[in-house]
Design a protein with these regions (language model features):
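C-terminal segment of N-terminal export signals and the immediately downstream linker at the start
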Residues: 1, 5, 18-64
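Sec-dependent signal peptide hydrophobic core
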Residues: 10-18
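Mature-region segments of soluble proteins
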Residues: 40, 45-48, 57-64, 68-71, ...
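Hydrophobic alpha-helical segments, especially transmembrane helices
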Residues: 4-5, 13, 155
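Short helix-onset patch at the extreme N-terminus, typifying the N->h transition
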Residues: 4-9, 150
């Protein structure tokens, strides 16, 4: 499976999860709906400059990991080139990183697979501890950080993490993979998906609100230029 197929399969699985509860209504009017989204009602895009949560060394290691998971190739830019490290840094500094919407007060006990991941640490804490453990392991095995390893060494270590055969947390690998995908496919206003590279890769049109002009093109490619939420503000 290549990168395009992997990203498309992720989007398809996400869509299937929402289909069961979704329903559509028919609008009788021929007039496009007014856009009521104003810039001050939207999250503000990350400003270039200093990191918000990650240290410079941590950001360097995250970039090295992300670029092995989504490397630059003929289909598009790498994860770090697409802004995925910026996306992650801002997310870890915000409510997601602090697990603001997650109950973590106990009682603590072994959960079931149906309950999903159970973690006492916040995502921000998991990154801080996970990157530290990864750095220690790389120094012990190779006398250099992950970012200093060869591509083959990096891939071998990531495969071992994913399989749970390395003395590193397989759940941390799953978190890394989840977040790099999110950064590559999220709206560019969150810092990743630069130039909407992820959306162009999978043919996603973005934040378009009215498809009536294209209803007659049944079974034909639309080839629409992606639209970001930033383009809809105002």
């Amino acid at each position: 499976m290549n990168r395009r197929e992997a990203l498309i399969s992720l989007v398809q699985l996400s869509a299937l999860g929402a289909i069961g509860s979704a329903s559509a209504g028919v609008l009788a009017s021929d007039r496009p709906l007014a856009i009521g989204t104003h810039a001050d009602a939207l999250p503000q895009p990350p400003k270039p400059g200093a990191l918000a949560y990650l240290s410079a060394d941590e950001a360097l290691e995250v970039a090295a990991i992300f670029d092995r998971l989504i490397p630059e190739d003929e289909l598009g830019m790498s994860a770090s080139q697409a802004g995925c490290v910026v996306f992650l840094d801002r997310q870890l500094a915000g409510p997601y990183g602090q697990a603001a919407s997650t109950y973590r007060l106990g009682p603590y006990m072994q959960g079931t697979p149906e309950q999903g991941p159970q973690f006492r640490l916040t995502p921000a804490q998991r990154y801080r501890e996970g990157l530290a453990r990864l750095g220690q392991y790389c120094q012990q095995q190779h006398a250099r950080p992950f970012s200093g390893l060869t591509g083959e060494q990096q891939d071998a270590l990531l495969r071992a993490m994913e399989a749970g055969t390395a003395p590193l947390d397989a759940d941390f690998f799953a978190l890394l993979l989840q977040n790099v995908r999110e950064g590559y496919l999220a709206d560019p206003m969150y810092g990743g998906n630069r130039d909407m590279v992820g959306w162009r890769l999978i043919g996603f049109p973005g934040a378009r609100y009215d498809y009536r002009p294209y209803l007659h093109r049944k079974g034909l490619p639309l080839d629409l230029e992606p639209v970001s939420l930033l383009d809809r503000a105002g």
